[in-house]
């Protein structure tokens, strides 16, 4: 219906002269037909709008929600009038009650009275625009109906008001009663206007509370104002409305108006009355208006406020706490907070006028709507308000779905709501979903699984039906999603943690049978399907598991699972290896090789990237469906779990890459390999156990360990040794070259070792260096057949020095020359086995030749090894502990550091109390240093600032300790001498430098170099006391890079390696031999 132009409202009868009243009566007679013709349409729009109000206004306890019937057909105009009376009849005003009584008696005594009398009564009673349709309805029925029906109608309409909701205290006075619908019904002297359902009048609502406190007679224009919601309007916006405000401003466009009427007309014409909370985020930023209370967005910033003032259920953000509270009360979302998602998102974005139809579509199967026909009669709807409004549920009379319907809705959608977003498993309760997330670590993987891995986790329909969550009771066995094979229905039965809790005594296995099964599977991977008929664990599965090792897993199952998930997902919160996750973020490459030693029962969806490999190779790696996965997984996963906890997977990666490379290089027939391996396994296990006992004995001899330490070593050592064997033999058995090799194992291993082996933080206790022990064991296991005749003496020397001060990663090359004692009694069983192991050992040698970490095995000069040019590394440990350079390798020229340290020491000022005060170096000294050393002034300033910061923060730095205590100790970086006073320290540094600091600005570089060659002899004599002078004692050696001189070739090589990072092959280039004088 087209919107009519709004005109000034009519005033109440108290202010209308008699002649105007008569003129209005005649005009209304002329417009009577128009008013009646609009009744049906008016009622339609009113009902639509009343439904919207029920959605947006729950703070008002209005009876409208239980008395109206928007769905039961529109019936007669009289039902509308009855509803209006029920909604807006006032019971709080004594004056209004008196008038109601008067009206009832008048209607009874003058049923056939003239229109003027009825008009006067209604004008005096209501004086509100919204009653005009009612008056016209009654007048029409008055003309056409009998006196009895008229009396019935009027009395019924009057009676419906006071009795509609006696228990609801209405806060509306008769003077301020108006239509609760969002349409504005303003009756003027010549028209009856009903706006279309475009929204309620904000500005009439703006004065509701003020009107409730104002007497009827004082209101100049009572018909302007609605009692509908002004919960969001601010009095500051308009000034104080009734204290002389001269302008009324539109909150959207800031247009100013002299009267509220004009502003109301403007608002209705332009549509500037819409609800802020339904605006889009982009539009909300254009708002200039402030909420009634002080805005949190002004105080905290918009982002912080939106994070705080946000509905946890639907995600709406609000400008003030009051807005959020109103929203919560209206929508009852505070009852639904624990679970997100159920509300259809479409209802948040559509206009309010269309929302009702969309809600009809959104929940067509709602139990509340069952059996309700649109054509229900008025009496039925009045008797059953719940049936009349399908959105009014027992717990909520204002329109949103909750209570019983919410319970039904949640039950219907529980499979989608309580669903793991990573693996797709559904759960019955939130607690089960939480337990599943914690056990599997999927809460970490959800955000970065698909995007970071570059692979989408494809879930087959059959697989989704088979997925079952990990239940809360720890004794039950659950299936895990077999996402790592190409044939989901043939997924193996993954064992959970509860399997690992079984008594290890039950898990005895015949190794020959195991290897036979692996061999059969290797030859014909397609024979595995019948074995998948059992979806749960059986006693046979437990019996087939290998013996030993699971008692350790009992204590580690929780920490290991979290460590694995964090290492795979790049979120390491555990200490020691802060950057370990970077190695596993190489895009989709390194992970492709992991499943050969993968722990399936802990990370079910971990192998989603295995899709890159061929199905044959996949089947071989995982052995799907046969009875051999339990032994394979128990052996290898036990190894992986411990290694991941201790070393962050560095070693497992190394061994995997070695095995994969060996497969690619030498693709030998699988059957003979498997047969030979049967002979290999038992001796190797015996050797590993012997090694374990031997190592533990050696640990306890030189070191006094606490029981906890020895327990840790006793626990982890045998498992590592044993399963390292399993890993090696597995690689030989499944000697099957993959069809597709997407990554060069050599480059992958190099990148990992380059990134991490140099960065692994040093162990706190040298006797508890699991990384070094694992390297030792794995390498000796690989190489033991190659050196079968090594004498016993070398093994003793290994064990004697192995657990001494090992503060750096072990030198992999050294262990190859010193095999185990038991290798003497274990001759090479066949050329095939020897060649396979030699391939592996050569691979390891090639990989570790350039990436050798620094040795942690001190030895004497007579015993040092020359393998792979590692002599310069060993000599570092031959020095006394004070000669070792700790911390990061410095790129500073040592001479420059000596100059800077000497200058800084000279700048210290001693106070009367004996303490030292730091004073800045003057610009002159900085210029001298800069000219001599070539360092920039900025670099010098940064070095000085860093030293001062360290001294202020900790009281010491590398060359100066205890400055804050008044008893400083100065350290010489060259010879580790200690000095108590700054002056002696400076004099000592000047002997190293070969010149005095005072002469720094006068000397040229050539003079200094010549003087250095002479004065460095004094320093070399100090070094000779350590016993490092080689046989060519008649000469000194000078470093060409920094012109420092050394007493021996070994010392200058050590200097080049430590200070300049030069390799031993390049030492000849940078060393100049000088004759001693």
Swiss-Prot record:
Residue ranges with Low complexity bias: 160-179
Gene for this chain: tshz1-b
Source organism per UniProt: Xenopus laevis (African clawed frog)
Role of this protein: Probable transcriptional regulator involved in developmental processes. May act as a transcriptional repressor (Potential). Involved in two major neuronal regionalization processes: primary anteroposterior (AP) axis patterning of the CNS and segmentation of the cranial neuronal crest (CNS) development.
Presence of keyword Transit peptide: no
Descriptive protein name: Teashirt homolog 1-B
Keyword Zinc-finger included in the entry's annotation: yes
Similarity field: Belongs to the teashirt C2H2-type zinc-finger protein family.
GO biological process entries: regulation of transcription by RNA polymerase II
């Amino acid at each position: 219906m087209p919107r009519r132009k709004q005109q000034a409202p009519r005033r109440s009868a108290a202010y209308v002269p008699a002649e105007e009243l008569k003129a209005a009566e005649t005009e209304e007679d002329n417009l009577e037909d128009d008013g009646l013709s609009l009744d049906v349409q008016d009622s339609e729009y009113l009902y639509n709008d009343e439904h919207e109000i029920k959605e947006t206004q729950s703070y008002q306890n209005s009876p409208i929600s239980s008395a109206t019937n928007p769905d039961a057909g529109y019936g007669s105009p009289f039902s509308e009038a009855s509803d209006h009376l029920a909604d807006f009849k006032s019971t709080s005003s004594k004056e209004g009650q008196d008038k109601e009584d008067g009206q009832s008696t008048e209607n009874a005594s003058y049923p056939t009275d003239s229109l003027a009398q009825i008009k006067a009564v209604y004008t005096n009673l209501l004086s509100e625009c919204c009653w005009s349709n009612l008056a016209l309805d009654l007048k029409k029925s008055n003309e056409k109906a009998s006196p009895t029906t008229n009396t019935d109608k009027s009395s019924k309409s009057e009676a419906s008001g006071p009795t509609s909701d006696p228990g609801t205290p209405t806060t509306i006075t008769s003077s301020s009663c108006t239509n609760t619908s969002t349409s504005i019904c303003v009756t003027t002297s010549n028209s009856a206007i009903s706006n279309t359902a475009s929204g309620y009048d904000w500005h009439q609502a703006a004065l509701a509370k003020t009107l409730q406190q104002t007497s009827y007679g004082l209101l100049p224009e009572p018909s302007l104002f609605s009692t509908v919601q002004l919960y969001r309007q601010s009095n500051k916006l308009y000034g104080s409305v009734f204290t002389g405000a001269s302008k009324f401003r539109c909150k959207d466009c800031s247009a100013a108006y002299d009267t509220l009427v004009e502003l109301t007309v403007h608002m209705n014409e332009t549509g500037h009355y819409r609800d802020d909370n339904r605006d889009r985020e982009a539009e909300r930023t254009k708002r200039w208006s402030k909420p009634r209370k002080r805005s949190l967005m002004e105080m905290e910033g918009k982002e912080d406020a939106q994070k705080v003032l946000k509905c946890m259920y639907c995600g709406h953000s609000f400008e003030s706490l009051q807005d959020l509270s109103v929203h919560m009360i209206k929508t009852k979302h505070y009852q639904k907070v624990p679970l997100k998602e159920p509300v259809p998102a479409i209802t948040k974005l559509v206009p309010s006028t269309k929302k009702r139809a969309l809600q009809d579509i959104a929940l067509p199967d709602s139990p509340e709507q069952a059996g309700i026909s649109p054509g229900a009669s008025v009496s039925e709807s009045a008797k059953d308000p719940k049936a009349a409004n399908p959105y009014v549920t027992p717990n909520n009379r204002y329109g949103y779905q909750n209570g019983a319907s919410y319970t039904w809705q949640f039950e219907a959608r529980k499979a989608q709501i309580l669903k793991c977003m990573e693996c797709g498993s559904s759960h019955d309760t939130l607690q089960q979903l939480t337990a599943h997330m914690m056990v599997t670590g999927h809460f970490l993987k959800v955000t970065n699984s698909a995007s970071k891995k570059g692979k989408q986790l494809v879930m087959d329909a059959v697989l989704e039906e088979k997925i079952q969550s990990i239940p809360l009771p720890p004794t039950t066995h659950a299936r895990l999603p077999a996402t790592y094979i190409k044939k989901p229905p043939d997924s193996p039965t993954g064992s959970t943690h509860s399997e690992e809790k079984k008594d290890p005594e039950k898990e005895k296995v015949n190794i020959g049978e195991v290897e036979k099964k692996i061999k059969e599977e290797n030859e014909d991977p397609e024979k595995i399907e019948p074995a998948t008929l059992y979806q749960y664990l059986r006693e046979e599965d437990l019996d087939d598991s290998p013996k030993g090792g699971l008692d350790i897993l009992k204590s580690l199952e929780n920490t290991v699972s979290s460590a694995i998930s964090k290492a795979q997902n790049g979120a390491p919160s555990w200490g020691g290896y802060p950057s370990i996750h970077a190695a596993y973020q190489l895009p989709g490459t390194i992970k492709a090789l992991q499943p050969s030693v993968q722990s399936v029962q802990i990370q079910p969806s971990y192998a989603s990237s295995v899709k890159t490999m061929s199905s044959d190779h996949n089947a071989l790696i995982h052995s799907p469906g046969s009875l051999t996965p339990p032994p394979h997984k128990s052996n290898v996963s036990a190894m992986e779990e411990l290694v991941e906890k201790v070393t962050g997977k560095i070693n497992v990666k190394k061994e995997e890459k070695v095995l994969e490379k060996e497969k690619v290089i030498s693709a030998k027939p699988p059957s003979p390999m498997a047969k030979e391996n049967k002979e290999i396994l038992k001796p190797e296990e015996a050797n590993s156990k012997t090694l374990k006992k031997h190592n533990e004995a050696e640990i306890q001899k030189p070191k006094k360990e606490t029981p906890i330490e020895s327990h840790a070593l006793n626990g982890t050592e045998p498992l590592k040794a044993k399963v390292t064997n399993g890993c090696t033999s597995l690689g030989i058995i499944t000697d099957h070259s993959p069809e597709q090799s997407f990554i060069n194992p050599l480059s992958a291993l190099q990148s990992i070792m380059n990134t991490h082996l140099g960065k692994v933080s040093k162990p706190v206790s040298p006797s508890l260096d699991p990384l070094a022990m694992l390297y030792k064991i794995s390498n000796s296991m690989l190489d033991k057949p190659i050196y079968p005749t090594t004498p016993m003496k070398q093994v003793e020397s290994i064990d004697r020095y192995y657990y001494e001060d090992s503060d750096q990663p072990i030198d992999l090359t050294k262990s190859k020359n010193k095999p185990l004692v038991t290798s003497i009694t274990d001759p090479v069983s066949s050329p095939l086995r020897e060649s396979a192991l030699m391939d592996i050992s050569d691979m390891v040698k090639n990989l570790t030749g350039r990436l050798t970490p620094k040795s942690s095995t001190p030895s004497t000069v007579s015993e040092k090894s020359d393998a792979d040019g590692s002599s310069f590394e060993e000599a570092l440990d031959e020095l006394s502990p004070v000669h070792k350079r700790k911390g990061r390798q410095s790129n500073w020229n040592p001479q420059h550091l000596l100059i800077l340290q000497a200058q800084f020491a000279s700048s210290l000022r001693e106070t009367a109390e004996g303490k030292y005060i730091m004073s800045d170096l003057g610009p002159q000294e900085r210029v001298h240093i800069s000219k001599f050393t070539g360092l920039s002034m900025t670099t010098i300033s940064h070095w000085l600032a860093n030293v001062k910061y360290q001294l202020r923060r900790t009281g010491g730095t590398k060359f100066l300790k205890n400055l804050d205590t008044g008893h400083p100790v100065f350290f010489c970086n060259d010879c580790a001498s200690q000095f108590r006073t700054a002056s002696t320290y400076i004099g000592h540094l000047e002997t190293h430098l070969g010149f005095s600091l005072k002469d720094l600005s006068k000397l040229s570089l050539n003079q200094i170099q010549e003087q250095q060659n002479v004065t460095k002899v004094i320093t070399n004599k100090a070094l000779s006391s350590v016993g490092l002078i080689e046989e060519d004692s008649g000469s000194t050696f000078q470093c060409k890079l920094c012109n420092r001189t050394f007493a021996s070739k070994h010392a200058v090589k050590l200097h080049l390696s430590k200070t300049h990072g030069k390799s031993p092959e390049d030492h000849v280039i940078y060393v100049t031999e000088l004759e001693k004088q």
